[in-house]
Amino acid sequence: ATCDLLSGTGIKHSACAAHCLLRGNRGGYCNGRAICVCRN
């Protein structure tokens, strides 16, 4: 979700990572389909 909302290369990945950190994950990244994928 966070990947579609923000345009720009680094910003959306940071928002995705922050979203995942808040959920207790180690971070996350945006895949090729603009989906935020959290790391375990």
Swiss-Prot record:
InterPro entries in alphabetical order: Defensin_insect, Defensin_invertebrate/fungal, Scorpion_toxin-like_sf
One cellular component (GO) term of this entry: extracellular space
Tissue: Larval fat body, hemolymph and salivary glands (at protein level).
Keyword list, A-Z: Antibiotic, Antimicrobial, Defensin, Disulfide bond, Fungicide, Immunity, Innate immunity, Secreted
Intrachain disulfide bonds: C3-C30, C16-C36, C20-C38
GO biological process: defense response to fungus; defense response to Gram-positive bacterium; humoral immune response; innate immune response; killing of cells of another organism
Compartments where located: Secreted
Any matching Pfam family: Defensin_2
PTM note: The disulfide bonds are essential for antimicrobial activity.
Family named by the database record: Belongs to the invertebrate defensin family. Type 1 subfamily.
Note from the entry: During maggot debridement therapy which involves the controlled application of cultured sterile larvae to an infected chronic non-healing wound, one of the key factors which protects larvae against the infectious wound environment and contributes to wound healing through its antimicrobial activity.
The protein's role, per its UniProt record: Shows strong antibacterial activity against the Gram-positive bacterium M.luteus. Also shows antibacterial activity against the Gram-positive bacteria E.fecalis, S.aureus, S.carnosus, S.pneumoniae and S.pyogenes and against a number of methicillin-resistant S.aureus and glycopeptide-intermediate S.aureus isolates. Does not show antibacterial activity against Gram-negative bacteria or antifungal activity against C.utilis. Shows slight antifungal activity against C.albicans.
Name this polypeptide is given: Lucifensin
Species of the source: Lucilia cuprina (Green bottle fly)
Lineage of the organism: Eukaryota, Metazoa, Ecdysozoa, Arthropoda, Hexapoda
